[in-house]
Amino acid sequence: MSLFGLSLGRLLEALRCLPGVGPKSAQRMAFHLLESDREGGRHLAQALLEALDKMTHCQTCRILSETDLCSLCADSRRDRGQLCVVEMPSDVQAIEQATSYSGRYFVLMGHLSPLDGVGPEALGMDLLAKRLDTDQIREVILATNLTVEGEATAYYISELAQTRGITTTRIAHGVPLGGELEFIDSNTLSHAFQSRRHL
C-alpha cells in the first residue's frame, strides 16, 4: 500500500506500464499532476480514454487510425508502387517528418522473434503477402530496425517480395551525417563499409 493511499498507489502502478517509466519517474509524474497540474491530469485522462475508445488499426497498412482506412492509404497522390515496411507506427511518423517519401506503408507491429513466440502470423505477413499479390507494388522498402530481429524480419519479407518478382531495397545505415569516424562504434562502421556505394 502506498504511503499516501490506495488511489495514489494505483496511479503509480498504472504509470509504470509506460515504456521507460520506473518507480521514480512514475512518482515524479504523479506528484506533478496531483500537486501542480490537476487540470492537466484530467485532460490527460480524458484524452487517453478517448484515444483508447476511438483508435483502431487501418485495414490496409495497420497504422493506428480512427477509421478503417487511414489518411495515408486514402491519399490518392501517394505512390501505390512503393511500399515501405516498418516495425511500429512511430516509424511511419519518423519517416513522414524526416523524408520526402510519398509511397505507401505496411506496419508490422513488431518483428520476428521466435524465442518470444512472435512468428509471421503475428506480424500480419498474410496481409502483407496479399498486398504484394494485388496492389501492383514495384518496390518494397525495408525499414525495419537494425537489430538481429529486425534484420531477420527484413530477410523474411525480402524473400516474400522477391518470389513475386518485386524489387526489394533496404534503408541505408552506417555513419550518421556529421559523425566523426573515431567516435563511431565498430558495428556501425562495419555496416557502413559493407553498404558503401558508387558516387
From Swiss-Prot:
CDD domains: TOPRIM_recR. GO terms for molecular function: DNA binding; zinc ion binding. Pfam families: RecR_C, RecR_HhH, RecR_ZnF, Toprim_4. InterPro entries: DNA_Rcmb_RecR, Rcmb_RecR, Rcmb_RecR_Znf, TOPRIM_dom, TOPRIM_RecR. A zinc finger (C4-type) spans 58-73. Keywords: DNA damage, DNA recombination, DNA repair, Metal-binding, Zinc, Zinc-finger. GO terms for biological process: DNA recombination; DNA repair. Residues 81-176 form the Toprim domain. Gene3D superfamilies: 3.40.1360.10, 6.10.250.240, RecR Domain 1 (1.10.8.420). HAMAP family: RecR. May play a role in DNA repair. It seems to be involved in an RecBC-independent recombinational process of DNA repair. It may act with RecF and RecO. Belongs to the RecR family. PANTHER family: RECOMBINATION PROTEIN RECR. This is Recombination protein RecR. It comes from Nitrosococcus oceani (strain ATCC 19707 / BCRC 17464 / JCM 30415 / NCIMB 11848 / C-107). The lineage of its organism: Bacteria, Pseudomonadati, Pseudomonadota, Gammaproteobacteria, Chromatiales.
